């Protein structure tokens, strides 16, 4: 597991089983039992706290990572690797995190 990968996860209800982008730093996946993730949704709102994803990123359809909904979950809720995001897409994720957390300068 490493930052920028997309995995299937069993999130608490009402969210349930869905893909998530791994957000925690790489070392967290080795040493920690809880990790931070961003859910991926088919609902694309085109807002600064979302990152559009799709077939070019290894996903079957157009969707978006929602950084407004980042959450920390037990690592054992991650079940199956889907794909990994490239450098430019992770730059977009970092920008969306800054926006979602109000860290814009």
For the regions a protein language model found, what residue spans apply to each?
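Conserved functional hotspots at enzyme active or ligand-binding sites that engage polyanionic ligands
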Residues: 1-105
């Amino acid at each position: 597991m490493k930052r920028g990968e997309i995995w299937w996860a069993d999130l608490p209800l009402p969210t349930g089983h869905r893909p998530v982008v791994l957000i925690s730093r790489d070392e967290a996946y080795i040493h920690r039992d809880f990790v931070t993730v961003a859910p991926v949704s088919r609902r694309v709102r085109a807002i600064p706290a979302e990152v559009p994803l799709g077939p070019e990123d290894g996903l079957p359809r157009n969707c978006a990572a929602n950084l407004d909904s980042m959450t920390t979950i037990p690592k054992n809720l991650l079940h199956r690797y889907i794909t990994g995001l490239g450098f430019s897409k992770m730059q977009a994720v970092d920008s969306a995190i800054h926006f979602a957390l109000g860290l814009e300068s």
